[in-house]
Structures are given as C-alpha cells and as structure tokens.
C-alpha cells in the first residue's frame, strides 16, 4: 500500500482512481497531477517506482487536501454562522442553504421526519 497525503492507497487501483481517494482530489485534478508528473493514467499503483511515488506525493502536497481542506470548509461555515447572515442561519438550522424548497423534499438535509404526538 502506498501512502499519499496521509491516506493509504490500494495497490490494485489505477493512478487516476487511486488519487481520488484523497479528500480534495477529484477526477480533473487527478488527471492534472498525472499530466504534470508524466505518469500514465493507466498504470497501477503497484507498478510505480519509488521515484514516481515521491513525484506524486510532492505534486499532491501543492494542493490543499485532507485535513487542511476539511478545516477550511468548517471554518468558513462557522464564519457564516458567526456573522448571523442568512446562509449562516440556514446552516445552523440544518436547512438547505442555496434557495431550495423545503415544504416538500429536503429530507436529506433535514433528516428523517419527526413523529407528532397525539
């Protein structure tokens, strides 16, 4: 198992798919990393040399990923809540933030229905 950005990555996966296991790296960024490091997207992690793995690690560290990105997201949400702005209040009430309807739908965000007592 290779270790990139503090995440264990399975050896049997292709490089592009394996990089997507890191929080903050999606398909586009994964392909960009492969392009910058001149590593073929079809190679599996198992077949990479130590130098290629080190190149991947260095390239991934140029982006904000994993714990730092999670911290940024939570701090930006907390900032909105502290400002008492509309978006912050929607986050606090656990309702949709971007103007979606809530009379029906929004069950994922609101959670399961609460039973009413008779």
UniProtKB/Swiss-Prot annotation:
GO terms for cellular component: cytosol; small ribosomal subunit. Signal peptide: none annotated. The keyword Ribosomal protein applies. Disulfide bonds: none annotated. One of its GO terms (biological process) is translation. Residues 93-118 are annotated as: Disordered. Belongs to the universal ribosomal protein uS13 family. This is Small ribosomal subunit protein uS13. The gene is rpsM.
